[in-house]
Amino acid sequence: MESRMWPALLLSHLLPLWPLLLLPLPPPAQGSSSSPRTPPAPARPPCARGGPSAPRHVCVWERAPPPSRSPRVPRSRRQVLPGTAPPATPSGFEEGPPSSQYPWAIVWGPTVSREDGGDPNSANPGFLDYGFAAPHGLATPHPNSDSMRGDGDGLILGEAPATLRPFLFGGRGEGVDPQLYVTITISIIIVLVATGIIFKFCWDRSQKRRRPSGQQGALRQEESQQPLTDLSPAGVTVLGAFGDSPTPTPDHEEPRGGPRPGMPHPKGAPAFQLNRIPLVNL
């Protein structure tokens, strides 16, 4: 029973001591601090009085020399002498550009100097010689920079780069897509087939126009070759094939050869019977 009561008695004695926890703690000692120790401030130089012309005593503090800068990356600055060309690389690129930043940058160089034949008084003294910044090392000039300069009278641009060559006249081993040649070949075949179809259609229409004119001429020629018959009432009456009565003929029948010369014409014969064509029974 006593073992169960002693924790309650201990808690009742410690409960009035809880306000002591709110008291501020004392600052830590300097020796026990884990933070780095700051260097002490430099002592000021002694105060010097002003000159005798000063109206009152003025305390002039002498200026301390500026701290020396630690040279991390030494940069050699070149002095440009009069009459010489500026350096090919701008300031800060003498030792080469950094390898991790902008490896594709183009460094523009100077113009053509007097030694190369350039005229500083002219409007165009020369070309800007450019180079490509390599990731490790100095900037390299363009390989065709010498061929791009002019001879004096005109400008010679040199050979055009391979990317500007036409694809039809360039070499086949330069990475030209073979599908381009297939497309051009198919297009030419389609144009030729369409042209042949158009010519065939025009030829058929011209032949159809010539056939009706030829048929009409043949019919006219056949009609002119058929014999003519006299169907006048005074002429000969044509009976059918089953007729019993004989065919009446006129009293004076002209011979088939027509009237002979020197023979008198019969009296009472009509004038149209002289040139009558003989009848042909079909």
Swiss-Prot record:
Q: Name one GO molecular function term.
A: protein domain specific binding
Task: Name its GO BP terms in alphabetical order.
Answer: cerebellum development; dentate gyrus development; gamma-aminobutyric acid signaling pathway; gene expression; glutamate secretion; homeostasis of number of cells; regulation of immune response; response to stress
List keywords of the entry alphabetically. Answer: Glycoprotein, Membrane, Signal, Transmembrane, Transmembrane helix
What's one Pfam family here?
Answer: AJAP1_PANP_C
Q: Which residues lie on this side of the membrane: Cytoplasmic?
A: 200-282
Cleaved signal peptide residues: 1-31
Q: How does the record say this protein sits in the membrane?
A: Single-pass type I membrane protein
Which compartments is it annotated to reside in?
Membrane
GO CC terms in record:
basolateral plasma membrane; membrane; plasma membrane; presynapse
Compositionally biased tracts (Polar residues): 213-229
Bias (Low complexity): 46-56
The record's account of how the chain is modified after translation? O-glycosylation at Thr-140 is essential for recognition by PILRA.
Give the main location. membrane
Q: In which tissues is it expressed?
A: Mainly expressed in adult brain and cerebellum. Weaker expression in fetal brain and virtually no expression in spleen, heart, kidney, liver and dorsal ganglion relative to brain.
The residue spans the entry assigns to the Extracellular side of the membrane are as follows 32-178
Q: Which residues lie within the region annotated Disordered? A: 28-99, 209-282
Entry-linked InterPro entries: AJAP1_PANP_C, PIANP
This chain is glycosylated at T140
Q: Where are the transmembrane segments?
A: 179-199
Q: What does this protein do?
A: Acts as a ligand for PILRA in neural tissues, where it may be involved in immune regulation.
Cite the PANTHER family for this sequence.
Answer: PILR ALPHA-ASSOCIATED NEURAL PROTEIN
Full protein name? PILR alpha-associated neural protein
To which species is this protein native? Homo sapiens (Human)
Gene name of this polypeptide? PIANP
